[in-house]
Amino acid sequence: MTTRNDCLALDAQDSLAPLRQQFALPEGVIYLDGNSLGARPVAALARAQAVIAEEWGNGLIRSWNSAGWRDLSERLGNRLATLIGARDGEVVVTDTTSINLFKVLSAALRVQATRSPERRVIVTETSNFPTDLYIAEGLADMLQQGYTLRLVDSPEELPQAIDQDTAVVMLTHVNYKTGYMHDMQALTALSHECGALAIWDLAHSAGAVPVDLHQAGADYAIGCTYKYLNGGPGSQAFVWVSPQLCDLVPQPLSGWFGHSRQFAMEPRYEPSNGIARYLCGTQPITSLAMVECGLDVFAQTDMASLRRKSLALTDLFIELVEQRCAAHELTLVTPREHAKRGSHVSFEHPEGYAVIQALIDRGVIGDYREPRIMRFGFTPLYTTFTEVWDAVQILGEILDRKTWAQAQFQVRHSVT
């Protein structure tokens, strides 16, 4: 059985361990929720102060030029591109994941309407993140052209669900509940064989697992920066479009930042060439600047190293939970196979919500998703092996003593 000393030894050998010092982590907290909101980079505080006091305070409107505000979305996109297998000039950091999905799904359906107008099906998973389903449903309803969602209940059913009626396959690479990771390349190839376009949501992938959009042959990708990329609460999302598709159609939110001649102030819209056309309105500079602090840390390592540690952390967590908590009603819902696992681990428990609240009370922060799913995120930039060991011991104590049954842990908060 793995001991705490074994975990201390793993931490001593961890080449990524020094990066933890670049994050502001509270004393007495084991943070296993970076899959929901990443920790604050230490540099973010000074960067925010510089943007507010210097660039805004002293530079005023001049900072759109002198501080490079105008091109910040594109510059950040170029830096983020290296983490997802994209190239310079193919990614912009802007808006929210929901808004960017609306843009790319609209564009994909418009492309398909010119190629195969008879296709009216959007294939996705029942367990996809709800906002993705809501956006697709709302767009289909708005278009009033007979588009329908075909919801698939398990990954194994996807190959049969994608057929000649499919216009778009819209999937999240790593499932937000289970941590199941799709084979992006295989499913994209299958989509293309059937004449469909593939949209990938990388919310739980970017900064967590290696992604190569070009190698996978993907058509569109979106994702957020506030999880593993540590961009801060509500930080801007990103959007990528295959160069073969990018200029075929305009995206529907034709704001002035996406205009080819923004300050010509022309009465009619003319989209920029390339990914800049996926910009819309004026960018939130203070928040965007925080994204760069997170990307600065990633520039000091590589995704292969992060993936190795992620798998080691999640392997250890699964092993320890199944040893320490074997007598309790815990069911692993995350795949054991490395090729199918993201960077978070989920266990089901009948009192999952209350257990998570009791853990938080003890300084171990995970989160809860309906129904009965306890999620634990492992961020290789700052999670240690010893923290994994300590967290499992605390979980075991809570289950042994039924601490979760206390009334205070039954109270439902608005955010779980």
From Swiss-Prot:
Membership in a protein family: Belongs to the kynureninase family.
Protein EC: 3.7.1.3
Gene designation per UniProt: kynU
Subunit structure: Homodimer.
PANTHER family: KYNURENINASE
UniProt pathway annotation: Amino-acid degradation; L-kynurenine degradation; L-alanine and anthranilate from L-kynurenine: step 1/1; Cofactor biosynthesis; NAD(+) biosynthesis; quinolinate from L-kynurenine: step 2/3
Phenotype upon changing D132E: Enhances binding to pyridoxal phosphate
Keywords: Hydrolase, Pyridine nucleotide biosynthesis, Pyridoxal phosphate
Function comment: Catalyzes the cleavage of L-kynurenine (L-Kyn) and L-3-hydroxykynurenine (L-3OHKyn) into anthranilic acid (AA) and 3-hydroxyanthranilic acid (3-OHAA), respectively.
Catalytic reactions on record: L-kynurenine + H2O = anthranilate + L-alanine + H(+); 3-hydroxy-L-kynurenine + H2O = 3-hydroxyanthranilate + L-alanine + H(+)
Entry GO MF terms: kynureninase activity; pyridoxal phosphate binding
Cofactor dependency: pyridoxal 5'-phosphate
Gene Ontology terms: biological process: anthranilate metabolic process; L-kynurenine catabolic process; L-tryptophan catabolic process to kynurenine; NAD biosynthetic process; quinolinate biosynthetic process
Name this protein carries in UniProt: Kynureninase
Mutagenesis / variant outcome for changing D201E: Enhances binding to pyridoxal phosphate
InterPro entries (UniProt xref): DegT/StrS_aminotransferase, Kynureninase, PyrdxlP-dep_Trfase, PyrdxlP-dep_Trfase_major, PyrdxlP-dep_Trfase_small
Modification type N6-(pyridoxal phosphate)lysine: residues: K227
One Pfam family, short name: KYNU_C
Any coiled-coil regions, as ranges: none
Binding site for pyridoxal 5'-phosphate: T97, S98, F129, P130, T131, D132, T172, D201, H204, Y226, W256, T282
Record GO cellular component, one term: cytoplasm
